[in-house]
Amino acid sequence: MEKLKININGKVAVVNSSGDTPLLWVLRDELKLTGTKFGCGRGLCGACTVHLNGVETRSCQTTIELLEPDDEVTTIEGLSKDNLHPVQEAWIEQDVPQCGYCQSGQIMTAVAFLKRNNNPNDEEIDSAMKMNICRCGTYQRIRKAMHSSSEKIRNGQK
């Protein structure tokens, strides 16, 4: 195995995994960043979503050999440096999580989407979030939280 350097949450981590290892398992097993969850292992449910250079990415389908030296990976643990991100705050205010398992992936998808569209309508939210599965069915609360967090973002809260 070759040692690889990966920029995760603003810090360079040296990992000892083979290049064909999915990023998800490097995050969880080697780096102990367990906020990113394993759901389906096929990139279909969204529980494993992280940001790769600011874009939502399924970490279960992204092998570490695909990462370039200047790539930046952000996990739920690195989403906000000081306080909670506005999306995280809205998730709490709207009481979105039930079991909470899918929520880190939901939040990471929402944050990336709201960077592209900070004033979405319901249809745009549903379209952006449709690849994230919540078995508890909290989709209505997710929509409310996204409207609330988009307002926070538009008002300058970071």
Give the ranges of each region predicted by the language model.
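Signature of N-terminal electron-transfer/Fe-S-associated modules in redox systems
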Residues: 1-158
